[in-house]
Regions:
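Short, charged, solvent-exposed linker or helix-capping segments at domain edges/interfaces
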Residues: 149-152, 226-230
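Surface-exposed, flexible loop/turn segments at secondary-structure boundaries
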Residues: 100, 108, 118, 146, ...
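Short, surface-exposed helix-loop/turn micro-motifs enriched in polar/charged residues
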Residues: 84, 191-192, 208
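Short, flexible beta-strand-to-coil junctions
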Residues: 95-98, 142-144, 218
């Protein structure tokens, strides 16, 4: 059984003010070929504030690290993103306007964690506020307990912090790459960046053996959003 810190127990009442979100089943109709997604993949920092439809958020999270097969290595489900010995040690937290959630791939839902808008904390101080109002920020958190206690396999030296870091940084990058490719497929903007690690660790009420690593911002490109607003304004003017 994994240890639970007092910090987590004290914060349980806060998350009750925020409701869990049951995500619709992911759909696979949108998008194009992998080659086209790779061609379009890029970092776009200028991101608008328009909210993503729940279906799009569902598809995004499944693409990031959702379950894609019931039987993976070492007796657990498989994910869209590989991880060291299928340890699945990277947790993805989702910061929305109303609060922060933990994505649960097995049940494909968002578990309420903390009320309030934490999106600004997911950008490091001094970073350009280009995407400050973007609708979604993913926060990547390494759970060392999952890495050390991988079912069915124990690599020599895995308790070495340097070895652990080499794994969880690579595994974070694999998830972030999936997000970039999904964004390229459906015309979204994505930006992988640093974040205020200590502030997020406290707000998310993480354990001592959990590490906040990076964040990734997703939304509609600001240029596209502005163009749509202008088009809608012209339509209203003609009515």
């Amino acid at each position: 059984m994994r240890k639970t810190s007092g910090k987590q127990r004290e914060g349980a009442g806060v998350s009750r003010q925020l409701q869990n979100i049951e995500l619709p089943a992911p759909t696979f109709k949108a998008g194009g070929s992998l080659a086209r997604a790779l061609q379009r993949r890029r970092t776009i920092r200028e991101i608008g504030d328009k909210a993503l439809p729940l279906q799009t958020l569902s598809n995004l999270l499944w693409a990031a690290c959702g379950v894609n097969r019931s039987k993976g290595p070492f007796g657990v489900t498989g994910r869209t993103a590989a991880s060291a010995s299928n340890s699945q040690e990277i947790d993805v937290y989702v910061a929305l306007a109303q609060g922060a959630y933990l994505y649960e791939p097995l049940h494909h839902r968002l578990q309420a964690v903390a009320s309030g808008d934490l999106r600004r904390l997911a950008i490091s101080r001094g970073q350009a506020p280009a995407g400050a109002k973007a609708p979604v920020r993913l926060i990547f958190v390494a759970d060392i307990d999952k890495l050390v206690h991988t079912s069915g396999f124990m690599e020599p030296g895995l308790r070495n912090p340097d070895v652990q870091r080499s794994y969880y940084y690579v595994d974070t990058g694999l998830i972030a790459a999936n997000v970039y490719l999904f964004a390229a497929c459906v015309g979204l903007a994505a930006w992988f960046h640093n974040c205020d690690k200590s502030a997020l660790w406290a707000k998310l009420r993480l354990r001592d053996d959990q590490r906040v690593l990076f964040a990734q911002t997703i939304g509609y490109p600001a240029s596209r959003q502005t163009a749509v607003r202008r088009q809608n304004a012209r339509r209203r003017a003609r009515v």
